[in-house]
């Protein structure tokens, strides 16, 4: 069973979709403005001030629909569920009736390739345009106990089909002495500052 999955496709009215687009564009602009970054940097440690040059593959803006339209509930820099929800929604799509929704999800292989390409693009934004992504680690605290572990497994298969070695690691196992480090970490752990002993 897919988390959050239902059997009904909910279509947004154009005004609500436009409101979401405007809000996301506004927030993205603010987050990358010099004045906002200076404000955040003033009270932050070196890990927060580090600017890797990439935007984030699964930067997520969680909107809930209500009587007055969409309301922003959460901004998530490492959102999960894109692959699972994409596959589920694609299974409900009727291209003849819902062409606007289905265009980004069908064929499924195209959607999957876009997800892989996002990770490659993020990697190259930091390492250079010709860099090869050879190994990726999906990292979380006690990953097998996580709500979206099924998606971790699907992502491993997806990366491996694209010729990228992939594995699921516990946060505390990521940087053991003598262990080969991955080229890229998809960090699902919510301890983003790595400020406790297990992620130090």
Residue ranges and their predicted role:
Residues 1-46:
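Low-complexity, highly charged intrinsically disordered N-terminal segments
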Residues 1-7, 40-42, 52, 69, ...:
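Residue-level signal for well-ordered alpha-helical segments
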Residues 27-31, 79-86:
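Short, solvent-exposed beta-strand-terminating loops
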Residues 42-48, 53-55, 161-167:
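Short coil-to-helix leader/linker segments, especially the first N-terminal amphipathic alpha-helix
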Residues 48-79:
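Conserved metal-phosphate-binding beta-hairpin within the catalytic cores
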Residues 66-67, 82-85, 90-200:
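Domain-scale recognition of functional cores that engage charged ligands
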């Amino acid at each position: 069973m897919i988390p959050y999955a239902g059997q009904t496709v909910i279509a947004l009215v154009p005004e609500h979709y436009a409101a979401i687009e405007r809000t996301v564009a506004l927030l993205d602009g603010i987050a990358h403005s010099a004045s906002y970054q200076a404000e955040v940097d003033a009270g932050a440690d070196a890990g927060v001030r580090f600017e890797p040059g990439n935007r984030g593959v699964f930067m997520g803006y969680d909107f809930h629909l209500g009587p007055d339209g969409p309301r922003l509930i959460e901004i998530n820099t490492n959102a999960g569920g894109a692959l699972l929800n994409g596959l589920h929604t694609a299974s409900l799509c009727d291209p003849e009736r819902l062409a606007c929704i289905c265009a980004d999800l069908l064929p499924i292989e195209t959607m999957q390739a876009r997800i892989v390409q996002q990770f490659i693009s993020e990697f190259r934004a930091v390492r250079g345009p010709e860099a090869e992504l050879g190994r990726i680690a999906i990292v979380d605290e006690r990953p097998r106990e996580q709500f979206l572990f099924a998606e971790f497994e699907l992502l491993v298969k997806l990366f491996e089909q694209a010729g990228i070695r992939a594995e699921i690691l516990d946060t505390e196992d990521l940087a053991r002495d003598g262990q080969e480090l991955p080229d890229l970490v998809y960090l699902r752990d919510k301890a983003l500052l790595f400020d406790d002993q297990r992620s130090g």
